[in-house]
Curated annotation (Swiss-Prot):
GO-annotated molecular function: L-aspartate:2-oxoglutarate aminotransferase activity; pyridoxal phosphate binding
Needed cofactors: pyridoxal 5'-phosphate
Function: Aminotransferase; part of the gene cluster that mediates the biosynthesis of the tetramic acids Sch210971 and Sch210972, potential anti-HIV fungal natural product that contain a decalin core. The PKS module of tasS together with the enoylreductase tasC catalyze the formation of the polyketide unit which is then conjugated to 4-hydroxyl-4-methyl glutamate (HMG) by the condensation domain of the tasS NRPS module.
Organism: Hapsidospora irregularis
Recorded family membership: Belongs to the class-I pyridoxal-phosphate-dependent aminotransferase family.
EC number: 2.6.1.-
SUPFAM superfamilies: PLP-dependent transferases
Residues involved in substrate binding: 35, 143
InterPro entries registered for this protein in UniProt: Aminotransferase_I/II_large (IPR004839), Asp_trans (IPR000796), PyrdxlP-dep_Trfase (IPR015424), PyrdxlP-dep_Trfase_major (IPR015421), PyrdxlP-dep_Trfase_small (IPR015422)
Protein name: Aminotransferase tasG
Modified residues (N6-(pyridoxal phosphate)lysine): 206
CDD domains, A to Z: AAT_like
Keywords: Aminotransferase, Pyridoxal phosphate, Transferase
Assembly with partners or alone: Homodimer.
Length: 325
């Protein structure tokens, strides 16, 4: 498989000290090694991860793609040295892949005549490329075309990827800003359900409004916990050599929201039936009572008014004032 031949990375003296301290059961031990802030009990927080997934924090989504590409190029010797990307696409993929020593190959993703995915081209690329190729797949809100796969298309894409032995490399930059938090990662979860190896790059810049905090994550899904441990050790080396560790503040904000039911509900709370009625009565904006809106109803001429109206209703409820401008 793709990652089974990955070996452990070279040891770092700081982590040797940490490993020795962690294995010492003497209650009087004092850890003066790794520079992490701890409480009076000597405890520090580490995010839980599933055993077969090697997860590391990265410097936003760009950092996740960079570290993921470096890992494939340096350590995953069973992965071919080229990556397939549908075009038009995000302009930073090519320099990131080139920097890692990987070649970017392209196929057509978008039909400008219809504004939809060129699905025949996508399937042709998957079916004709060498077995074991890597495909960068944007999970939702395709940049720059906004042409996403439907669920039915995802079913076919994932089945074809599995059949032809390819590695999915997901770029998840807009989760929750497309169809919904769960819907936007349908392709990722489908691969997980099939037990496929994959790389998943996550950004929390846009969906959490944390651009300046550069918060992201890289997940490498492996075939076993032993493989995942070796993969994570290689990721540790890459991060240590390049920027040592990621900033904690943004990650703590994300963790706070996702671990607090009330905070998460506030982030995901849709427009209520009453708020939709208020939009209609006060602002002549019409939406179905469940709060879903059709983006195609917005234009350059009305988007500012609509945004101000929705903001007024959400902030002020039934006392919303008519937006200006």
């Amino acid at each position: 498989m793709f990652f089974d031949s990955v070996t452990n990375g070279p040891e770092d003296v700081m982590y040797q000290v940490k490993a020795a301290c962690d294995s010492d059961n003497d209650p009087s031990k004092i850890d003066l090694g790794v520079g992490t802030y701890r409480n009076e009990d000597g405890d520090y927080h580490e995010l839980d991860v599933l055993k077969e997934i090697a997860t590391v924090q990265t410097i936003s989504g760009t950092g996740a793609i960079h570290i993921g590409a470096m890992f494939l190029a340096r350590s995953a010797t069973d992965v071919l040295p080229h990556v397939y990307v549908g075009t038009p696409t995000w302009g930073n993929y090519q320099p990131l892949l080139r920097l890692a020593g990987l070649e970017m190959r392209t196929y057509n993703h978008y039909l400008s005549q219809t504004g939809r995915v060129d699905f025949a081209s996508v399937l042709s690329a998957i079916r004709t490329t060498p077995r074991g190729s890597t495909f960068i797949l944007q999970g939702c809100c395709h940049n720059p075309t906004a042409a996403d796969f439907s669920r039915e298309q995802w079913d076919i894409v994932v089945a074809e990827m599995e059949s032809h032995g390819h590695l999915p490399f997901f770029d998840i930059a807009y989760q929750g800003l497309g169809e919904g938090v769960d819907e936007d990662v349908y392709g990722v979860r489908l691969c997980a359900d099939k037990g496929m190896e994959m790389v998943v790059c996550q950004s929390f810049a846009k969906n959490f409004g944390l651009y300046g905090e550069r918060c992201g994550a890289l997940h490498v899904v492996c075939t076993s916990d032993d493989v995942a441990a070796r993969v994570k050790d290689q990721l540790r080396c890459l991060i240590r050599w390049e920027f040592s560790s990621s900033p904690a503040y943004g990650a703590r904000l994300v963790n706070l929201v996702l671990s607090d039911a009330r905070a998460e509900e506030q982030c995901l709370l849709p427009l209520s039936k009453t708020q939709c009625q208020e939009l209609q009565n006060k602002f002549r904006i019409y939406a179905v009572p469940n709060g879903r809106i059709t983006m195609s109803g917005l234009s350059q001429g009305n988007i500012d008014y609509a945004a101000r109206a929705i903001d007024a209703v959400v902030r002020s409820g039934l006392e919303a004032r008519e937006p200006t401008g």
